[in-house]
Amino acid sequence: MSILKEIYEYKIDFVNKQKKLHTQSDILSKLKNITSHDFSFSKKLKDEMSRTSIIGELKRASPSLGNFVNEEINLSNIAQIYEECGVSCLSVLTDEKYFKGGIEDLIEIRKISTLPILRKDFIVDEYQIYES
């Protein structure tokens, strides 16, 4: 089996389990209580065309680098440092199996940062979009 097929099958199974824990209806009802902000990733990059834009990546592991893992890393602290240093946007890896992240990382970063955030994951279902 190819690695992409393996990832796809794993992610389909994982998302189906998540749907049983938190239904899409539950997620949509929570979204109604969220205050709207302008977190447009593409708009932020276009607005800063006069300077080099940097996207700060936040991840706990990297399979391409020999699968180093640092699950104890404080992503919120790193996000704050990135913001203080002037990054334009943030990218948060939320894949559990391969990058040791989670949707909780995305939620935590959103609480402390006003920058646009990209959820970086293997997206296989619209459920994940609403979850983001």
Task: Give residue spans per PLM region.
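Catalytic cores of alpha/beta
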Residues: V124-E131
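Conserved N-terminal beta1-alpha1 strand-loop-helix module at the mouth
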Residues: M1-I117
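Short beta-strand elements of ligand-binding domains
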Residues: R119-D121
